[in-house]
Amino acid sequence: MARVMLSQKHRITECGSGEEYMISMYENIVFDKSSQQHFKTLFDILCKDLDGAILYHCTGGKDRTGITTLYLYTLLGVSEEDIIEEFSTSDIFNKKYNKSRETLIKIFMPTSKRTKALLIALLHAKREYLEAVINKIKDRHGSVLNFLYDEIGITKEMQEKLQLIF
């Protein structure tokens, strides 16, 4: 993780702050055509008649997983405020993990204090990250649900199937 974060420090610095970088990263996850195709594949799998459970996660459990959960909960009819609140709980559950990563950054990363502060900001699941990308989606599509229909390729039938399954 430290190598990836260090390799991205120029992009982080260009954005001005860790928070701005995170918002731009979330926008990339949402609006990148390749990412959209991966999300479509995920929802195709979720709509299949499968035995057992499906688990999804990522390294930190907040970025790609957070966007996936935004999409799934939207399709299930969960309120936007509840989705954002749920996303924000990631910081509670990752508190120990984040603390250890902060310590590693402070001690072992050969970079300035400012860059370290920016990198530390990346560890957190701030509601502002998700709110910003939701607002950008709404600006372009009117709602997250419209975005899922227009860009991800979700159909009303898929949404109804997911509501039956979950």
Which ranges hold each PLM region?
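Ser/Thr-glycine-rich phosphate-binding loops at phosphate-binding pockets of nucleotides
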Residues: 59-60, 64-65
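Cys-dependent protein tyrosine phosphatase-like superfamily
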Residues: 1-55, 68-166
